[in-house]
């Protein structure tokens, strides 16, 4: 028995060494696998950063949507009557033409009936323009201003050496704005033959009306 044990001793030692080596390799592999796996805390941090970024983007989109909606609602309130206002301006134009068709002499010598009719038409015109103004429609007053193609439509030139070139000197048809938009440009006559306009900062039509 002793001889057999002695005889098998080296083989047993080699087997044990191989087993230990295999175990060590397995442990090393296990350690390496654990090392390759990401840290749960780092994963949570990355996930938190991603969620925060998504939240900020969503908040920005919601804020932009809110602003855009507010602007669209404001525009809808301001400009929803634009089509109706244009139709009413056509009626107002007809009232003005009717009044302008009556000569000063006819007005001066008019009987009570004609005088009452004229006053009624004038009152109707004023009431209509006042109603439009309450809805944001304002009349342009371009006489004396420098011609501005954004608000005026030049119909003819008037020789005039007393005022700078391109000064509005006559209004053929009144112009109107609604909010910050031109509802209808004023049809005007502009001066020609005068001195060149002085280069200076000119307030916009809206600024002058608001002053």
Swiss-Prot record:
Subcellular location: Cytoplasm
The organism's taxonomic lineage, starting at the top: Bacteria, Pseudomonadati, Pseudomonadota, Alphaproteobacteria, Hyphomicrobiales
Segments of skewed composition (Low complexity): 11-23
Origin superkingdom: Bacteria
CDD domains in UniProt: GrpE
Name of the protein in question: Protein GrpE
Basic and acidic residues composition bias: residue spans: 33-43
Functional description taken from the UniProt entry: Participates actively in the response to hyperosmotic and heat shock by preventing the aggregation of stress-denatured proteins, in association with DnaK and GrpE. It is the nucleotide exchange factor for DnaK and may function as a thermosensor. Unfolded proteins bind initially to DnaJ; upon interaction with the DnaJ-bound protein, DnaK hydrolyzes its bound ATP, resulting in the formation of a stable complex. GrpE releases ADP from DnaK; ATP binding to DnaK triggers the release of the substrate protein, thus completing the reaction cycle.
Keywords associated with the record: Chaperone, Cytoplasm, Stress response
């Amino acid at each position: 028995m002793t001889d057999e044990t002695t005889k098998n001793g080296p083989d047993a030692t080699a087997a044990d060494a191989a087993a230990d080596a295999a175990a060590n390799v397995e442990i090393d592999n296990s350690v390496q696998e654990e090392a390759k796996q990401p840290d749960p805390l780092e994963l949570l941090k990355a996930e938190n950063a991603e969620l925060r970024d998504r939240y900020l983007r969503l908040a920005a989109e919601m804020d932009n949507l809110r602003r855009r909606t507010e602007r669209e609602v404001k525009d809808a309130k301001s400009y929803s009557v634009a089509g109706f206002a244009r139709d009413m301006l056509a009626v107002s134009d007809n009232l003005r033409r009717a009044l302008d068709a009556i000569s000063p002499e006819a007005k001066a010598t008019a009987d009570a009936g004609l005088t009452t009719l004229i006053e009624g038409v004038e009152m109707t015109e004023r009431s209509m323009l006042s109603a439009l103004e309450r809805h944001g429609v304002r009349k342009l007053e371009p006489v004396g201003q420098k011609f501005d193609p954004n608000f005026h439509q030049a119909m003819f030139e008037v020789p005039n050496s007393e005022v700078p070139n391109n000064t509005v000197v006559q209004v053929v048809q009144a112009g109107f704005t609604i909010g910050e938009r031109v509802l209808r440009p004023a049809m005007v006559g502009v001066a020609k033959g005068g001195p060149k306009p002085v280069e200076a900062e000119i307030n916009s039509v809206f600024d002058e009306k608001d002053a």
